[in-house]
Design a protein with these regions (language model features):
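Glycine-rich segments within core transmembrane alpha-helices of 12-TM secondary carriers
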Residues: 31, 35, 184-185, 239-243, ...
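Conserved MFS/SLC helix-loop-helix module at the cytosolic interface between two early adjacent transmembrane helices
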Residues: 187-209
């Protein structure tokens, strides 16, 4: 593994220049469109439109009886508990001799004479000269549909449900298919995460893309729903990895200051992709056409093979420096920067030279204290049992796992439940995607000012209360129900955005990946229930909303027992994780940014190649690079070592500030670029004068760890 920190490389070639912008937006497209279409196209492909029993004896009477009159004759009413009529039954019919009833009606038909009393009735019947048709008798015997169903084709020309009659006793099939899709995603997330770590992000991306395109197209030709479900299960292996891995590749090309921004923007891309799916569904109303339209075009993404590079962070982690050098040189050229040839090799030599020389210029092997320190055995590695063994960590972990389940179930449930709101399926789904966009903007602004804890609590509470309130809305006030459901979607989308930042900041560094992997798996198991929650709409339109709203409110109430992480030094060891938040106050609010002097120690630098094998179902940022933030400093003092606070622009990392001083780091450093790394352009990024650097260290910082870094820089100048 190379000793080069890629964030330090980005100081020279640009943290977010033209190259990163091009790659980021290309990767956003490849991450969000396939993922949104793959996960949510089934909302329209397997939609269940209004339906009722088919009565063959009445099929030829369309000229004599309207649709409503045929329903009134053949279908029993479904009544509410208060006895009020709700609607016609979808799965039951009167078990009578319809031929005899119709013949009797036609035989007794007499052309009525116009009178004052029945003039209106005659005008209504003048087209046929027939009296009003017979209507069903509630006392007639009732049976299940015997001859299939008739489907309302106002919104859909055809769906898998209408083709295969997956209604009534078979209405559980679409929910089961969705559940098996997410079973596949549980294992695919682990498998492709391992592939991405072992063979590279780029390799994993094209493997996932191949899997999705092939099986999505194959799904379009399913002869029955068993085959369809099997193919969807295999297709589930590619979700959410098809979203996760391109996004992580994009993040690994950027500097740490821009990763929060990148995380929010890709959320907006995903929401836009969902709205686009609704538009496609509206334009292409046949499930087969829609299925092909949401799979075949992604063949074009294979052209990325000649555009998208491998992650240079991953290449450096595998010590493939020459391959990373090619990418870095291209990055610098497009960003308008100039770096010397063999830039990474020279940087590695320089780093090794630093590591081989102690602060006073002596070789570390000659320092007995240094050898004694090196001989100390490292502390035992953290294990999943540490999540159970430590009470405070255990409490936080179980709350986070429950909140993860709540967010995942409610978000996906509200997305799929768009077809049960009583308005156009396309319109409801389209609005559901649009309301997510402002939720991300507001969350991005709020969570760095109000804190993660209260924003998570309030957004989950908002979404939950809105959904539960649907139980008080009259049945015919459909747009009130839709509005409340959209407020629920707004709240849960916002809470999901802040949750991924919060969960990474709460867990200690040594346990972060393992804990997130376990919590992610628990959330994935909980997610298997949401299709059946949505299916409960066959009994009551608002029942799924009530259940999901209750779950969201429960998540909001548990989240207030988590400590705030805004502007707080993040835990790194098991001991720090156990102490973190142990004495927090329930109704406390986030504090103002704290100075470096108030923190016990600074955070560890981020890993150059974070593991993907245990990432979350819906990841926003990579584990170490995005979540481990540095402590803030008092901006009233000109401290040259500013730390990254919550990933916000305007604060620079330790490596950037070291480069900004323009100082060489070893006595042997020379300006000759053939022998040492050129740092000339770094001086342009510095913001301090020589007079400021000459000020006494003890007047500028109080933290001894920061002072040591400055002293080491001074000694090498």
């Amino acid at each position: 593994m190379s000793s080069i920190d890629f964030d330090e490389v980005l100081v020279h070639v640009g943290e977010k220049g033209k190259y990163q912008n091009i790659m980021y937006y290309l990767l956003c497209i490849s991450a969000t469109l396939p993922a949104a279409f793959l996960a949510f196209s089934q909302v329209f492909v397997s939609a269940s439109p209004e339906h009722w029993c088919r009565i063959p004896e009445l099929d030829n009477l369309t000229d004599l009886m309207t649709l409503e009159e045929r329903k009134a004759l053949s279908l029993p009413y479904v009544e509410k508990s208060d006895g009020k009529v709700k609607k016609y039954s979808k799965c039951k019919m009167y078990d009578v001799n319809y031929t005899a009833i119709v013949e009797s009606w036609l035989e007794n038909a007499v052309l009525e004479n116009a009178t004052e009393e029945d003039g209106e009735a005659q005008r209504t019947r003048s087209r046929s000269g027939l009296p009003p048709p017979p209507v069903g008798n509630p006392d007639w015997p009732v049976t299940k549909c015997r001859h299939g169903w008739i489907y309302d084709n106002r919104d859909y020309d055809s769906t898998l449900v209408t083709e295969l009659d997956l209604v009534c006793d078979n209405s559980w099939w679409p929910s089961t298919s969705t559940t098996f899709f997410y079973v596949g995603s549980l294992f695919g997330n682990v498998v492709f995460g391992w592939i991405a770590d072992k063979w590279g992000r780029r390799t994993a991306f094209f493997a996932i893309l191949f899997l999705e395109v092939i099986f999505s197209i194959a799904t379009s030709f399913s002869p029955n729903y068993v085959i369809y479900t099997a193919l969807r299960t295999v297709n589930g292996l590619s979700f959410p990895a098809i979203y996760q891995i391109p996004f992580i590749l994009a993040l690994e090309l950027m500097g740490p200051r821009y990763r929060t921004f990148a995380g929010m923007v890709i959320c907006m891309f995903f929401a836009s992709a969902m709205s686009l799916l609704a538009v496609l569904g509206y334009l292409l109303r046949h499930w087969f056409t829609l299925s092909l339209a949401t799979s075949v075009p992604f063949v074009l993404l294979f052209s990325y093979y000649w555009i998208i590079p491998e992650s240079p962070r991953w290449l450096l982690s595998k010590n493939r420096i020459d391959e990373a050098e090619v990418i870095v040189q291209r990055m610098a050229k497009i960003n308008g920067r100039t770096v010397p040839n063999n830039f990474l090799r020279k940087m590695e030599v320089e780093i090794l030279r630093r590591q081989g020389v102690s602060c006073n210029g002596t070789n570390s092997s000659e320092n007995p204290e240094s050898n004694e320190t090196e001989d100390r055995s490292p502390p035992p590695a953290a294990t999943p049992m540490d999540l159970i063994r430590n009470p405070n960590i255990r409490k936080k972990f179980f709350i986070l796992a429950f909140d993860w389940v709540a967010n995942a179930v409610v978000y996906n449930g509200l997305s799929y439940n768009a077809t049960n709101l009583g308005v156009s399926d396309y319109l409801a789904f389209f609005i559901g995607g649009l309301v997510e966009i402002p939720s991300y903007v507001i969350t991005w602004y709020a969570m760095d000012r109000l804190g993660r804890r209260w924003v998570l609590c309030l957004t989950m509470l908002l979404g939950g209360v809105a959904c539960v309130s649907c139980m008080f809305v009259p049945e015919d006030a459909v747009w009130v129900t839709v509005s409340l459901a959209m407020i629920g979607k707004f709240g849960i989308a916002a809470s999901f955005a802040v949750f991924y930042v919060f969960v990474g900041e709460l867990l200690p560094t040594v346990l972060r990946s393992q804990a997130m992997g376990i919590a992610s798996f628990i959330a994935g198991i909980g997610l298997l229930a949401f299709p059946y929650i949505v299916h409960l709409a066959v009994y009551s339109r608002v029942l799924p909303l009530i259940i999901m709203g209750t779950l969201s409110v429960a998540g909001a109430l548990t989240s207030i027992f988590l400590p705030e992480t805004l502007n707080i030094h993040l835990p790194q060891t098991i001991e720090e994780g156990e102490l973190f938040g142990a004495d927090f106050k329930l109704w406390s609010c986030p504090t103002l940014p704290r100075s470096v002097s108030s923190s016990p120690s600074s955070s560890s630098p981020p890993s150059s190649s974070p593991s993907l094998s245990s990432r979350s179902l819906f990841p926003r940022e990579n584990d170490d690079d995005a979540f481990i933030k540095k402590e803030s400093v008092d901006k009233s003092e000109s401290v040259p070592l500013r730390f990254l606070v919550n990933g916000r622009p305007g604060n620079r990392s330790l490596q950037e500030e070291s480069a900004a001083t323009g100082a060489a780091t070893t006595p042997e450093a020379k300006p000759d670029t053939e022998n040492s790394l050129s740092m000339e352009h770094a001086s342009t990024t510095g913001q301090e004068t020589e007079e400021e650097l000459a000020r006494p260290i003890d007047k500028r910082v109080d933290d001894p760890l920061v002072a040591v870094v400055i002293v080491e820089q001074r000694r090498t100048q």
